[in-house]
Amino acid sequence: MERIRSYRAQLYAHVRSHWESKSTPWITQLCGKSGMGKTTLARSYLEAFNGEYFSLRNLDAAFAPRIFLSGCKLWKDFFAEIGETKNRPVIFFDDVDDKNDKKDFINALPALAGKAYVVLLVRNLMELPFPFDVIQMTAMTMPMLLAENRALEPLDALRTIAITDGIPELVRLFDFQKSFAENLSPLFAHDSAYFCYAESELRRNFRTPETYNILLYGMATGYNRISQLSEFSGFPQNKCDKYLKALDKAGLLETEQKKDAAGHIRTHYYPKGGYWKTWFRYVFPSQGRYLEVQKEEALQQLVDEMDKTIVVEYFKKVCWNWLEKNYHSCYWDGFLKFDDPKQRDVMVNGVRFDCVQETKDHTIYVKIWDNVREGFPKEAFQKIEAATTAVRPFYENIYFLFSAGRACNYVEEVRNLETVSVVNLKSLVGQKNKDVFEKL
């Protein structure tokens, strides 16, 4: 609830600033995708400070005034009536951006200026014909989750955020008194909020979700180039391109330039975020019944697989964010960028690196250990050392080594060298790295 209290204080500051100075807008858009807690925040604010709340959900916008206040046929009449309240209330309007017929509602809103403070709860920022403030609600992060659940292991926090994208509505489904594996069975059940969230979002965005489900399932299971998706789905490539653009517009698609099997740089397509990857890979094929009969051993096997397919990918994103912010801890001679696909996924004398970058005086090596249950092992570093020093002396190489677990003692000793940075999950969630998670 600390997150909600923080947003509530931010909203209260907007309201207070407006009434004290009259120089700030009389309306705020409270933005956040489904499940971020917009309605929870409105409820919390109303309990603390009073006000009014109206939802346009399942209502024709033109008909809504009659529902909200008997005898009011038009929005201007409704606003005139509630504007007579003497205590200058804060008025919340929920589900506003669901409506295509909201022109009269928007045009009539200025009648409340000076009489009330208006908060619009929306998923996406709306264009309005008058000034407004914005509060953007974002997802929970690993540091937030660990702060609220101090007994929670960092690895389980990583897993939780990885498969929920930190969406509060989904995170709260977890019982952190149980193991991560024990949480999966009720989480993936056909009547759980985890299962229903995807269905609801797909129906909201598409008239025929079934068409897009095929492509999202294909992407989640390894068909990531447009030619592969076309072959998998049976759709011509031009139709795939059209559907991919629609998925992108809905915020459900991410693209990455990376090497294909032949080493050529190609566009690869993925469901956006770990929740959608998890849902389409593990929940969608069996429509929520996958885990109902699974026993402890099978659940643990599923956790093992998810660690390799979902969790490690999220961990890598955290590592890249840390690297962009902190590479100067080992490299002081200039600026580095790590987004060139030609420098990603490079083999050096039989050892694969996540990134290899040549500079005038050094070679930069990045290795992210892809077993999230382990620390960086001695044998792996010895292979790295042998492969890289065959190209260039050790002191001319700079190594960034990441692992979720604490590295072995041998590798921990190596971190004392100026050209080696060893980073684990526990150090990543420190206070100084909060923005590393906020960028995800």
Question: Where does each model-flagged region fall?
Answer:
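N-terminal pre-P-loop "Q-motif" helix
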Residues: 3-18
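Walker A/P-loop nucleotide-binding motif
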Residues: 24-43
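Conserved NTP-binding/hydrolysis module of P-loop NTPases
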Residues: 48-84, 278
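Conserved P-loop NTPase "ATPase switch" module shared by AAA+ and STAND
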Residues: 79-105
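Conserved small helical "lid"/interfacial subdomain of P-loop NTPases
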Residues: 132-159
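Amphipathic alpha-helical "lid/sensor" segments that cap RecA-like P-loop NTPase cores
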Residues: 149-201
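Accessory nucleic acid-recognition modules appended to NTPase machines
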Residues: 188-348
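Domain-level recognition of nuclease-like catalytic cores that cleave nucleotide substrates
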Residues: 398-440
